[in-house]
Amino acid sequence: MEEKYVPARVEEKWQKLWDSNKSFKAEKVEGKSKYYLLEMFPYPSGRIHMGHVRNYSIGDVIARFKRMKGFNVLHPMGWDAFGMPAENAAIQHKSHPAKWTYENIDYMRGQLKKMGFSYDWDRELATCNVEYYKWEQLIFLQMLEKGLAYKKKSSVNWCPRCETVLANEQVEDGSCWRCDSLVEQKELEQWSFRITDYAEELLEDTYKLPGWPERVLTMQRNWIGRSTGCEIDFSIEGRKDAIKVFTTRQDTLFGATFMSLAPEHPLALQLTTAENMIVVNAFLDKVKKTDKIKRTAEDFEKEGVFTGSYCINPVTNRRMPIYLANFVLTDYGTGAVMAVPTHDQRDFEFARKYAIAMEVVIQPEGGSLDVATMTEAYTAEGIMVNSGRFDGLNSAVAKEQIADFLEQEGLGKKTVNFRLRDWGISRQRYWGNPIPVIYCDDCGAVPVPAKDLPVVLPMDATFTGEGGNPLSKIDSFIKTTCPLCGKDARRETDTMDTFVESSWYFLRYCCPDFACGPLDKGKTEYWMSVDQYIGGIEHAVMHLLYARFFTKVLRDLGYCDINEPFTNLLTQGMVIKDGSKMSKSKGNVVDPNALIEKYGADTARLFSLFAAPPEKDLDWSDQGVDGSYRFLNRVWKLVYECLPLISATGPLDAAALTDEGKTLRRLVHKTIRKVSDDIEDRFHFNTAIAAIMEMVNAIQAFEPKNQPRNVPVLKEAVESVVLLLAPFVPHFAEELWESLGHEDNLNEAAWPAFDAAAAVDEELLVVVQVNGKLRGKVTVAASATDEDIKGAVLADEKIRQLIDGMNIKKIVYVPGKLVNIVVG
């Protein structure tokens, strides 16, 4: 064994061995418990950052720990490789997106290997590889056949800078999640997935995921947004059709005084009279420049315009003016809102602004509302008034009775509505998965026959930065023949949202080389579900929801038998420096390469795991990195100095140990239990590492030289330190394990066994209080009775002096912890 710890030499040695031996290759093993550990795969941006280091270090600890516990571990890695940054880089560097992407993958793969992460690299996949995306095209065709994929014209979120459509989930505070440009509204024909068909199941199954953070589940439940209410028809004056409204507040129907339509509502222009057309068109132009999320914000100014038309309240026969309102969306309900200004705050503000009539229909119990003096809407329960036969009822009771009344009279029906909208997947970008559809003037939209897949992304695209989709300019790609009639036809030039690729990659990892379809059912049945998934909470209502949806779709298509993809979910915190998230723009980035070069990968791993619990943000500290490096050097020195003494020692005889030996062994086994629990049950790696550090301190203070019978426990302690450190600092631990004379690698070694008998305390340290104030500590035998302990406390010299001459009223003993003497 070398006297000095040289990280570069140690890490290069073990990385080569792991690579050549395929040490982490996962195979299906019947009869062995499997464990599928997965971190969200990265976009190949060019370099890994400290967020990657932390995320993947967390996962690697769990993977290595589970291997040592005897599990058959699957721990794969791949690349979420399609996406707009590759096109932007192509323009900037005058390089093809494929070249840029694959060069980045090669570099980042090397970085990950230098970190010592225990991936099965034989399962590596890149979503931009045709061998991956061709199966996604087949899944699309099967979804199309089942009616789960469709195309229609709709109002979409449009990023003018990226020149592509964004899903609602990709709009953050009115801006594009990728480039921060203000999002606009645009009418486009686009492909969508019918995720709403699975809304009920997606919602119900959130209650079957006890291993997920409640915060994520709540975010998904709110996004799905199930609400029960009524669908009511309001006839339109002078027309035979009606406006359908969904409401959860049918108890306020008698107070509806006007109708608010979404500007995008199909009846918006039809209901606009000639004298109102100019002002309505101006209003519509203004709304198109405002994104939908901003329009629904509470503090957003409510604006509208009168169409000139009226509808009829079905229960009061009131003539209700029809307005277009900027806060109403077609994305929720029917795109029409029966406005009840006295009992809805948005309607109240709107009615006050445009001088629209109001009617109170719910009074607070024991109170009275007057429209003339109201300063805000009354939205709580109360007593029904001005509501015909329902007057005097509690509004909650009336809500149910009015729903029944509407159904009986044929005026409406009870229904369930979801906030969740179908997932628009069309993107006007080149670097994505081509949608396998052909357009024929005679036959319409025709699916590409499965035998003709894949539709390969052409490599001869030109990237000028002038905007638009490069695919739409490649005649050799666009021009084709109709599969049905053989006439000239053209290909779809939209590509799929990159969230489609990340919605099933975890399944493909189970069978990355399967050539007969998207999934090998036997292998997916063995490995799925993912036992532990790790990634950021920012994916709660995008990737994590889409992945759940896709898993259910693939189940229904017969590819797998699971309902949920991820049994347990850990959402790790960010890495921050100088009070904010690391970013190039803020100049607070720490380069992992520089860190590895100076300290080694194991120090980088150790610090990222020790500095904070995984679910919390990690505050970067250069001093903390130095401290982690010093600790590893201390352990190295300890093993080096102990090696001559322990290398030839015999088996451990617990009965022969001195008191000092028993004390050390007790600490060893308490530490084994704590580290095991902290990794397995809590993922509190920071407290696990702290416990190992305390154990190292105890070993350093241990002096066995004059007591040969204690040498075996020193060996047990030193080997336990190495084994316990193995998941955290694997290169370091492998080198020490080999130096200790072991021929097996640590990924083949067993986790140290906990000996409960060895961990039992022979003595207890009892805290002593007098009238609740700390006055001392007393050591007693662990086997002492309650009365023995009380007697020992009263016999203690210091305590005896404190209570001398006082009247002892009672003695309270908290078993194993403290004695409180109450005196008067």
UniProtKB/Swiss-Prot annotation:
InterPro entries: aa-tRNA-synth_I_CS, aa-tRNA-synth_Ia, Leu-tRNA-ligase, Leu_tRNA-synth_edit, M/V/L/I-tRNA-synth_anticd-bd, Methionyl/Leucyl_tRNA_Synth, Rossmann-like_a/b/a_fold, tRNAsynth_Ia_anticodon-bd
E.C. number: 6.1.1.4
Cited PROSITE patterns: AA_TRNA_LIGASE_I
Binding-site residues for ATP, renumbered to this chain: 584
This protein's GO CC annotations: cytosol
CDD domains per the UniProt record, alphabetical: Anticodon_Ia_Leu_BEm, LeuRS_core
Class of enzymatic activity (EC top level): ligase
Gene Ontology MF term list: aminoacyl-tRNA deacylase activity; ATP binding; leucine-tRNA ligase activity
Catalysed reactions, as listed in the record: tRNA(Leu) + L-leucine + ATP = L-leucyl-tRNA(Leu) + AMP + diphosphate
Motif ('KMSKS' region): 581-585
Principal subcellular localization: cytoplasm
Domain of life: Bacteria
NCBIfam families: leuS_bact (TIGR00396)
HAMAP family per record: Leu_tRNA_synth_B
Family the entry assigns: Belongs to the class-I aminoacyl-tRNA synthetase family.
PANTHER family in the cross-refs: LEUCINE--TRNA LIGASE, MITOCHONDRIAL, LEUCYL-TRNA SYNTHETASE
Entry protein name: Leucine--tRNA ligase
Organism for this UniProt entry: Geotalea daltonii (strain DSM 22248 / JCM 15807 / FRC-32) (Geobacter daltonii)
Originating gene: leuS
